[in-house]
């Protein structure tokens, strides 16, 4: 399964790297040349799971333009920066 992690802060990026050790995937952080809109468009089309580390509202607004169908969309999960909570947003039920 191809996974991609996106963090919004340094703290979130550190957590994304720890998560990627257990569930391998690419890790990115918004900022500089890496925009939220660009990252989401790229990874929504190519990966089977997107894991955002940060606020649910940011993730929802980022994925909204790309959502097509339950069968076609990747799984999308948001993890809080503290690593305490994970909120599944899309399609996880169809992967298993």
PLM region spans:
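Short Gly/Thr/Asp-enriched flexible loops that form oxyanion-binding sites at enzyme active sites
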Residues: 61-72
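Conserved small/polar residues in nucleotide/adenosyl-binding loops
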Residues: 96
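Short glycine/serine/threonine-rich phosphate/pyrophosphate-binding segments
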Residues: 12-15, 58-62
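Short, acidic/small-residue loops that bind anionic groups at enzyme active sites
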Residues: 71-92
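Short, structured active-site "lid" loops
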Residues: 39-60
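General beta-strand structural signal in soluble alpha/beta enzymes
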Residues: 27-32, 51-54, 78-79
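N-terminal basic/disordered segments at the start of proteins
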Residues: 1-31
């Amino acid at each position: 399964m191809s996974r991609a992690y996106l963090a919004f802060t340094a703290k979130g990026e550190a957590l994304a790297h720890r998560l990627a050790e257990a569930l391998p995937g690419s890790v990115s952080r918004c900022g500089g040349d890496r925009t939220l809109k660009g990252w989401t468009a790229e990874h929504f089309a190519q990966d089977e799971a997107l894991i955002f580390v940060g606020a649910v509202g940011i993730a929802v607004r980022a994925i909204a333009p790309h959502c097509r169908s339950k069968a076609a969309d990747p799984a999308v999960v948001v993890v809080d920066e503290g690593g305490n909570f994970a909120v599944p947003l899309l399609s996880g039920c169809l992967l298993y």
